[in-house]
Amino acid sequence: GQSISDNGKWVACKMEPWEGDAVVNLYDAQGKELATFPRADRFLFSASSDYLVVSQKPGKMIVDSLKIKKTKKDKLPMDALVIYSLLGDREVIDSLKTFKLAEKVDWVAFQKGRKDSTLYVQPLNANLSTRYEAPAVKAFNFAEKSGMLYYITAGDKAEEKPGLYLLNTETGVKTLIKEGDGVFKQVTFDEDGANLAFLYCAQKNSCYKAMSLWLSQQGAPATEVVARGNQALPKGWVISEHGKLQFSKSASRLFFGTSPEPRQKDTLQLAENRPNVQVWSWDEPVQYTVQDYNKE
């Protein structure tokens, strides 16, 4: 694969051999090679075109040798994240679990370590001291056209309450949009990050029937806009936890999915008391009794 920076001055190409590790090479507009990144996986130019962000996998030969030695999965080496400045400087973040790069600002959010669920948010410019951290984060993402970031956290006992937060990376303002340790799904920004919609259910085992739609506007705490039993929903219908939330282009409309309330398995009925129906065709070449015997 290949990628061209937005200003057209830089090109990154990924070379993948039939067997072994991939390499990302960085070139200028004249075709001069500027840098090489071995064991490369994902690679992205920043919004300003001043940085190239590359995630690196552990070497395949190293991982294979460790697997042969029956090394436990949690003892295998982890990925790394390289933040390369087109001026030549680079920062390496080890033990990478996952990362998201903002599309319109030079910021990155990531988690590292297998047992550490802390979210780290920082500018790509290593000379800037601004850093943010959030504990026990389950999910996070940037808005498409701004530096707004949401994250869902289980919280901690000290400062952070459980719930959905909104972080403005440009101002440093953090807002608790919805407090709760229930289930958040389909968290969705509009393009500019001014509005944030999501589904929420307080009880995990009731998500199939009790999801409600929430909306935060201009960074304000979210309010519930549609819930089970709303007059707009047909009788017996619920907000679907699988439906995709989507704002219109102007963000004046919000689309969400509905469905008849799903039927759930009766867990109070013993298996031997449930009807056992067998279905087969009259013209099958092998009789059902023989099929049943062969299956056993």
Question: Each predicted region: which residue ranges?
Answer:
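Beta-propeller folds
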Residues: 1-296
